[in-house]
Curated annotation (Swiss-Prot):
One of its GO terms (biological process) is RNA decapping. This is Bis(5'-nucleosyl)-tetraphosphatase, symmetrical. It catalyses: P(1),P(4)-bis(5'-adenosyl) tetraphosphate + H2O = 2 ADP + 2 H(+). Transmembrane segments: none annotated. InterPro entries: ApaH, Calcineurin-like_PHP_ApaH, Metallo-depent_PP-like. One of its GO terms (cellular component) is cytoplasm. Its EC number is 3.6.1.41. Hydrolyzes diadenosine 5',5'''-P1,P4-tetraphosphate to yield ADP. Pfam families: Metallophos. The lineage of its organism: Bacteria, Pseudomonadati, Pseudomonadota, Gammaproteobacteria, Vibrionales. Keywords: Hydrolase.
Length: 269
């Protein structure tokens, strides 16, 4: 019984299948954790959703920003992004159950030794606060009010956490921290613009969220995806698994028990 954690798939279904063959994944015995962004720019978002859906309890999924955007497109709130290849999902005869299942996935998933989220955990949160914050958004996404949240979540503000935040401002910060965050300012505020590799940010005004000196220490390893420019980042406290398969890089999967990494290069289109 092993736990496998895989980075952003973004519709790169064939690469995922190759990884699972490498690892000899057994859905009857093992658990497969997904770091979000099941869908978007790759060619097989529909096949990916169907596969993860049918895994049932063998799959643990957290929502990514592209997953949330697909829900927004399905609701008619926004248009698909230029490079997205998600129309097949919207046109599928099983679109309704797939999207209903997707919106009920969490922002944060926990193992005894690690936590999984798409972008990271706000440096201003301890683990108890992160759990509570995730549950607040998850409860709305699973309620009749979910469409309103999806419509109103698109903003870079507020960029700082405070326990007194209320309403859509509070929910928007939580969504941004879990699904969009990369860099923070030294005072802990989120920066939603810069997508560069950290080594290319030289003026000291921005730091990766996991390198802020005042970041609250967590008692579990944080595993995340989202940030392909990190090219897979590993430290004592965080593990980044997005290695840019959809951009021609690789799809990366970690077997937690022995910390073995599996890698599959992007296949020709």
């Amino acid at each position: 019984m092993a736990n496998y954690i895989v980075g952003d798939i973004q519709g790169c279904f064939d690469e995922l299948q190759q990884l699972l063959k490498q690892a000899e994944f057994n859905s009857q015995l093992d658990t497969l954790w997904f770091a979000g962004d099941l869908v978007a720019r790759g060619p097989k978002s529909l096949e990916t959703l169907r596969f993860v859906y049918q895994l049932g309890d063998a799959a643990r999924v957290v929502l990514g920003n592209h997953d949330l955007h697909l829900l927004s497109v399905a609701l008619g709130h926004h248009s698909a992004k230029r490079r997205d290849q998600t129309q097949a999902v919207l046109d599928a005869p099983d679109a309704a159950p797939l999207l209903d299942w997707l919106r009920q996935q969490p922002l944060l998933a926990e193992h005894q030794e690690f936590v999984l989220c798409h972008a990271g955990i706000s440096p201003q949160w301890d683990l108890a606060t992160a759990r509570q914050a995730a549950q607040e958004v998850e409860s709305v996404l699973r309620s009749p009010e979910w469409s309103t949240l999806i419509e109103q979540m698109y903003s870079d503000q507020p960029d700082a956490w405070h326990p007194t935040l209320q309403g859509i401002d509070r929910l928007r910060y939580i969504v941004n921290a879990f699904t969009r965050m990369r860099f923070c300012f030294p005072d802990g505020r989120l920066d939603m613009q810069c997508k560069l590799p950290p080594k290319e940010v030289t003026d000291g005004s921005l730091l990766p969220w996991f390198q802020l000196p005042q970041r609250i220490a967590l008692e579990k390893t944080v595993i995340f995806g989202h940030w392909a420019a990190l090219e897979g980042y590993v430290s004592e406290t965080v593990i980044g698994l997005d290695t840019g398969c959809v951009w021609g890089g690789t799809l990366t999967m970690l077997r937690w028990e022995d910390k073995h990494y599996f890698s599959q290069a992007a296949l020709p289109a």
